């Protein structure tokens, strides 16, 4: 398997509706579902959920 198949680059978009995104990698074997992380959104100046975008 190629490196990019196991750990693809994914975009995490803010659920606050600001359009702010984080870019990260994820392991498909450990996390086959869409990722949801609670991170800081500087537009609203709060911690909000960021969901994986495909």
Curated annotation (Swiss-Prot):
GO MF entry, a single one: structural constituent of ribosome
Record InterPro entries: Ribosomal_bL33, Ribosomal_bL33_CS, Ribosomal_bL33_sf, Ribosomal_zn-bd
UniProt KW Glycosyltransferase keyword: no
Cited Pfam families: Ribosomal_L33
GO cellular component terms attached to this protein's record: cytosolic large ribosomal subunit
Top-level division of the source organism's lineage: Bacteria
Keywords (A to Z) from UniProt: Ribonucleoprotein, Ribosomal protein
Gene Ontology process terms (BP): translation
Residues passing through the membrane, by range: none
PANTHER family: 54S RIBOSOMAL PROTEIN L39, MITOCHONDRIAL, LARGE RIBOSOMAL SUBUNIT PROTEIN BL33M
Family designation: Belongs to the bacterial ribosomal protein bL33 family.
Cited NCBIfam families: PRK00595.1, rpmG_bact
Protein name: Large ribosomal subunit protein bL33A
Organism: Mycobacteroides abscessus (strain ATCC 19977 / DSM 44196 / CCUG 20993 / CIP 104536 / JCM 13569 / NCTC 13031 / TMC 1543 / L948)
The organism's taxonomic lineage, starting at the top: Bacteria, Bacillati, Actinomycetota, Actinomycetes, Mycobacteriales
